Amino acid sequence: MAIDLQQDYFSLFGMPRRFRIDESALEAAWHGLQGEVHPDRFAHLPDVEKRRSMQWATRVNEGFRVLRKPLSRAQYLLELAGVDAAIDTNTAMSPEFLMEQMEWREAVEEARAAGEVDELEQLHLRLRQHSREVHAGLADALDDAGDYPAAAETVRRLMFIEKLQHEIDDALEALEN
């Protein structure tokens, strides 16, 4: 078994290069590849073969890690398309989005400060629904329209949303302990 370490992750797993993927097919492909390249299968071979199997296994695991999460999959698709999402340098967002984020954060802080677990859970549910809607827009931008600048902006938006979801989770955990 030889894996081309230069092929993209979608090709590695036999998946179409799209945002919308069959996640169960991805997992099945990952399990299949893991069975073929797992270092234990090469333990009796010379060191060079052991190192090669470790490289293959690392590549397979990294590919699975990137493709199984929608946000990292979107970032990877942008990278493959030659689009720099400028995640670290471009934090400019629309005033409407920033206002929305401030409102979300204020609501989370108020619920946390008041110890309102039910309110935090409701905020979490509403944010999860909002996240689904934004993901759907991202899928449309990447798969249907090929609008990479819009997709890059949506990726940056989703990073804010994901961070807020973690803040709600942390607040819930703090209140429940």
UniProtKB/Swiss-Prot annotation:
<dbReference type="GO" id="GO:0051087">
    <property type="term" value="F:protein-folding chaperone binding"/>
</dbReference>
<dbReference type="InterPro" id="IPR036869">
    <property type="entry name" value="J_dom_sf"/>
</dbReference>
<comment type="similarity">
    <text>Belongs to the HscB family.</text>
</comment>
<dbReference type="GO" id="GO:0006457">
    <property type="term" value="P:protein folding"/>
</dbReference>
<dbReference type="InterPro" id="IPR036386">
    <property type="entry name" value="HscB_C_sf"/>
</dbReference>
<dbReference type="GO" id="GO:0001671">
    <property type="term" value="F:ATPase activator activity"/>
</dbReference>
<dbReference type="GO" id="GO:0051259">
    <property type="term" value="P:protein complex oligomerization"/>
</dbReference>
<keyword id="KW-0143">Chaperone</keyword>
<feature type="domain" description="J">
    <location>
        <begin position="8"/>
        <end position="80"/>
    </location>
</feature>
<protein>
    <recommendedName>
        <fullName>Co-chaperone protein HscB homolog</fullName>
    </recommendedName>
</protein>
<dbReference type="Pfam" id="PF07743">
    <property type="entry name" value="HSCB_C"/>
</dbReference>
<comment type="function">
    <text>Co-chaperone involved in the maturation of iron-sulfur cluster-containing proteins. Seems to help targeting proteins to be folded toward HscA.</text>
</comment>
<dbReference type="GO" id="GO:0044571">
    <property type="term" value="P:[2Fe-2S] cluster assembly"/>
</dbReference>
<dbReference type="InterPro" id="IPR004640">
    <property type="entry name" value="HscB"/>
</dbReference>
<dbReference type="InterPro" id="IPR009073">
    <property type="entry name" value="HscB_oligo_C"/>
</dbReference>
<comment type="subunit">
    <text>Interacts with HscA and stimulates its ATPase activity.</text>
</comment>
